[in-house]
Amino acid sequence: MFQDNPLLAQLKQQLHTQTPRVEGVVKGTEKGFGFLEVDGQKSYFIPPPQMKKVMHGDRIIATLHTDKDREIAEPETLVEPFLSRFVGRVQRKDDRLSIVPDHPLLRDAIQCRPVRELTHSFQNGDWAVAEMCRHPLKGDRAFQADLTAFITNGEDHFVPWWVTLARHNLEREAPAMVESALNDAELEREDLTALNFVTIDSASTEDMDDALFVQDNGDGSWLLTIAIADPTAYVVENSELDLTARKRAFTNYLPGFNIPMLPRDLSDNLCSLRPNERRPVLVCRVTITEEGTLSNDIRFSAAWVESKAKLVYDDVSDWLEGNNRWQPQDTAIAEQITLLKRICDARSNWRQQHALVFKDRPDYRFLLGEKGEVLDIIVEHRRIANRIVEECMIAANVCAALALREHLGFGIYNVHTGFDPALVEQAASVLKANGVGADPQALLTLPGFCELRRHLDALPTQFLDSRIRRFQTFAEISTVPGPHFGLGLEAYATWTSPIRKYGDMVNHRLLKAMITGQQAEKPQEEITVQLAERRRLNRMAERDVGDWLYARYLQPQAGTDTRFTAEIIDITRGGLRVRLLDNGAVAFIPAPFIHAVRDEVVCSQETGTVQIKGETVYSQSDKIEVRIAEVRMETRNVIARPVA
């Protein structure tokens, strides 16, 4: 009777049209229910039965209903799924497979099956790559995924590395070597093999890409010659090797090992500036005055060099600091180290006055056993030899930036514009509230930014510095020259690590065109996008492996009385993020661990403080004592508690 009734259809259409709808992102909880967050402002409750249709992170459209004075969201349409490609652990039960995504808020197993091409017989605990293929909001009965790749079995000691690389779709192996020979016969190389070039690196470094030589001019100035390995002498543009390097973009440095951008035979052998081996290089010569100024006599050329010594950071630092456990092999090498130290001091002083110098932060190095277990974490402080190399490389990169800008007008530039113009007023307000007067428009200029940074660096704590970082832009990669506010420089283009950075290889080719007077093509914008994306993925991979190893390392300390000194690095509504200064691990302190009465404690990201009953008890950048309360291995989270 009601079938095909136009009035009923019209009524249904009206009801559908009149039902309020919102678009937002699903936020899951550990208790089965969830919330639909709309524009970060409003959230609507999603009951457990409705949560079975969606997944944490899904962007959906939902209808709104009222139940007992509470607005409830009922998922209706999928806009964008949270999961597409993901990694997880396989569960096998009665020949049926399911996979649990490796994500802290996704705990439900998803039915799955291997794609036809995958021949591996999956077992319980295996790690796999999967692709979502069914979703309840697409009309399917349940979630389902296809297993597209086997990563490793659950017993593999190197799970943190293999799973992380698979998650970010990064390579596990070095590229295969392709027959390569020197291919730049048209490039005239001067013979500098008689000069006393030295390399300074870590003891374990094999891919040495920079060597240094200094000549004392006798008038207080020095002629610095920076020789950089020349992989483009072997890697032809658009060749198979070049396309591989372009895709990888960087050597991927993970705890315990690296995955090179170029085949190891090139990176660690043919191109590496090994001692007493003749190598093709690009060379930059520049006079540095007694005050540390770079003169206008910058000159680039192609050359042959032969490193006379592979020096190690700690050895050189010890010798310069008067610890005689190590000695240079001869007086010529000793003289080079002494002259390099003088250049370092002059350049550092110049940059402190006219540019910006980063505050020294220690590096943390995992000492690993044969099975990937963390034996120890070594704190490596930056010493004088590290600063020597850093000052010489910064000088070389400034020279390249200026030369490319003058001769070509383009290159691969590192650009950082300081404060976000949309947020600079907020930055000025925070500064003013903390007793630092600042003109928003002046902060957007390089001199104004540098003046502020020098003032902040002179303050007794990092509180204000850490407060205003969120108003700054991120460094970018650009094909046109631009300032680098973070370094306090008007232009910066790296070319000193071509073995491990594809952007530096691009700049090598441009510098060669400049040297030979040939026509050069401006790099395509797609290259900068690829470089930025790969840099982001490599950093995430390094962080993820590090989190896994820290969780393994700190698990035995959970629940013990062992105390750690920690620095507060972030304050969120839910608690504090701290960095343990002894080993570099990041831990979370939930607000209830700070004060038992939740209503009396306020953790404010806006003010960078924690208040109890209106009294400030913690501020961002404070150093506090903590104990490890818990280590959650499944999410690699370290939970700490303040020592009372």
UniProtKB/Swiss-Prot annotation:
Reactions catalysed: Exonucleolytic cleavage in the 3'- to 5'-direction to yield nucleoside 5'-phosphates
Domain RNB: 189-516
One annotated GO biological process: mRNA catabolic process
Residue ranges constituting the S1 motif domain according to the UniProt record: 561-643
SUPFAM superfamilies assigned: Nucleic acid-binding proteins
Annotated EC: 3.1.13.1
Gene Ontology cellular-component terms listed: cytosol
Record's keyword terms, sorted: Cytoplasm, Exonuclease, Hydrolase, Nuclease, RNA-binding
Annotated compartments: Cytoplasm
NCBIfam families (UniProt xref): 3_prime_RNase, PRK05054.1, RNase_B
Function of the molecule: Involved in mRNA degradation. Hydrolyzes single-stranded polyribonucleotides processively in the 3' to 5' direction.
Family label: Belongs to the RNR ribonuclease family. RNase II subfamily.
Protein name: Exoribonuclease 2
Organism annotation: Yersinia pestis
Organism placement in taxonomy: Bacteria, Pseudomonadati, Pseudomonadota, Gammaproteobacteria, Enterobacterales
